[in-house]
Amino acid sequence: MNPNQALWEKGDFTHIAAATRESGQALVERIGITRGMKVLDLGCGDGTTALPAARLGAEVTGVDISRPLVRAATERAREAGLTNIRFQQGDACDLDGIPDHAFDLVMSIFGAMFAPRPFDVARAMVRVTQPGGRIVMGNWIPNDPTLVAQILRISAAYSPPPSE
């Protein structure tokens, strides 16, 4: 098993995902999603941004490395009666099985930023975005005062730099 996948499958991250739903909704409201757009939510968790995008009429695919989060997202979409959304387990570093230029919009809020190889993620995001499409990310920032940002800052001091 991919070590990053093993990490994200160790705990119940739906509680953290629930805490980010307001941020996910706010992002979706600001990025101009329209009916029929093809949208990829990368590091989708339990559907934090994917579900609001689907409610606007977009055709949404959510990808997350964690099988439990993919199951939770699928269940939330079913409970909401959304049929224009699907979720799949996958690695943001390569997006195997997703064709080139498949999406009008690729978005990730508090998801892709955790991938161990950020340059691979960036390449994959560009590859699956249509020419003229958009990539939108919501990430914690270096001077963010939140507890999570402080934990990440401390962890970074003891972590090797990402490989290119």
Model-derived regions: residue spans:
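Conserved class I S-adenosyl-L-methionine
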Residues: 1-37, 48, 72, 152
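Class I SAM-dependent methyltransferase SAM/SAH-binding core
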Residues: 38-95, 120
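A short acidic, Gly/Pro-enriched loop at the edge of an enzyme's catalytic core
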Residues: 93-106
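A short SAM/SAH-binding and catalytic strip from SAM-dependent methyltransferases
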Residues: 104-119, 141
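Helix-to-beta-strand junctions that scaffold the AdoMet/dcAdoMet cofactor pocket
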Residues: 115-116, 129-131
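Conserved catalytic/acceptor-binding region of the Class I
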Residues: 119-120, 126, 134-164
